Amino acid sequence: MQDRIMYIENKSDGDGLTGSARIGRVRFSKTGKTIYYRGAELQSLKGYGYKANYFDVNTGDYFWVSGPKKNGQDTLYPDRVEVDEDVRIEYWRDIRGIEATVDESSFRSEGKHASWRVVQFTKSRKV
């Protein structure tokens, strides 16, 4: 099985759009349709999920799993992202390229839609 550092967000923890977010090492099944992370078995929704692409076969919780972004803006909306201890150095050094922060166990992601909201607010304020 192949393993890789990924962004994992439990959409069932929040309102369906946001939830607890982590950077951690996952293992993929041979087919790549199942991901194993911290004892959970996540199966692909095959494109049928709303803001989620995997679900936990044991709990039914929905997850968004993707490769971590180099700029750290993995979340849809501003939120805190925890970094698992076993991937911390590799994540900060190899993915983010910021060796000075290897001791950081979490960071704030401004979110994918943060800049869009600022632009929309600015446009709506023009007279």
Task: Give residue ranges: language-model regions.
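Mixed-charge, low-complexity intrinsically disordered regions
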Residues: 1-25, 40-127
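Short, conserved beta-turn/loop elements at beta-strand boundaries and strand-helix junctions
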Residues: 30-37
